[in-house]
Amino acid sequence: FPCQNLILFQPNLPYRKERLFMDRKVRVIQFGTGKMAVYTMRYVLEKGGEVVGAIDVNPNVIGKDIGTIMGKTEMGVKVTALENAEETIRTLKPDIAIVTTMSLLNDVKDALMLCAKLGVNAITTCEEAFFPWNSNPQVTKEIDDLAKQTGCTITGSGYQDIYWGQLITSIAGSTQKITKIKGSSSYNVEDYGIALAKAHGSGLTLDEFDKQVASVDRISDEERQKIIESGKYLPSYMWNVNGWLCSKLGLTVKSQTQKTIPTTYKEDIYSSTLGTTVKAGDATGMSAVVTTETEEGITIES
């Protein structure tokens, strides 16, 4: 995405197709103008789309031109304050919204619900939104129901879509028998936005990490399920990926657990993303392992 020729197949009608946006560029509005937005807005422009607006909560960027934010010449599109988001969307009438703000569904709910309310297709880099049904089903259903009412699509995507998802299912599809799927992935939280860094516990002392991040894993399956149903569960990224893999492969989840371990560094290290120095021995991030057992006898560990 975005595409200049969108093929729309209408259900319950004789087969026909309509080409939209033949004579104009796809109109995109950007939610959040941080590190990830610099890339997503550039990608939109490179693929022939048009960024018609941008929305942010940070007073330091409100009123700035998006060209300046991207390190380009000014483009005549200024960042709008979040409180004016609905008015901005109604005025600009975008085809697509890109939401690159936070990592948890509860934190992007308002933006996604607004898009659903106004019938604007939205895609988000929120990691939980990749497959939120197994971590926050209540909010997921709220967004899903509203999007269906207004006829738009709300979806989560990103790195995991290809490398933790489609790539694995493609390989699995060529395999005669599977007993276990095991994988690992590493990345530098400094290369991403502050939402990802905070979700990984970066900058916390080990005691803070234990209380705020790791403690959620030291509970029974029944306790975890209650927290999930309450909408307060804090999933690691692989929690949602494992759920996605099971759904895609037609596997029935019997149990799923996660364990998070802080990573540290022997010296003080400055983080431009956090805007502070992480002390030696404090958490620079985390290692998360999610293990899923299925009724079909296949284990997924990632």
Regions found by a protein language model. Give the residues of each.
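N-terminal glycine-/serine-/threonine-rich beta1-alpha1-beta2 phosphate-ribose binding loop
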Residues: 8, 12-16, 22-117, 250
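A short hydrophobic/small-residue beta-strand
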Residues: 121-123
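Short, hinge-like loop/turn segments at secondary-structure boundaries
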Residues: 69-73, 141-143, 172-174, 199-201
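Rossmann-fold NAD(P)-binding glycine/threonine-rich loop
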Residues: 127-151
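Short alpha-helices
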Residues: 148-177
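Active-site-lining helix/loop region of Rossmann-like oxidoreductase modules
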Residues: 27, 31-35, 173-302
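Short, ordered loop/turn segments at secondary-structure junctions
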Residues: 57, 102, 127-130, 159-160, ...
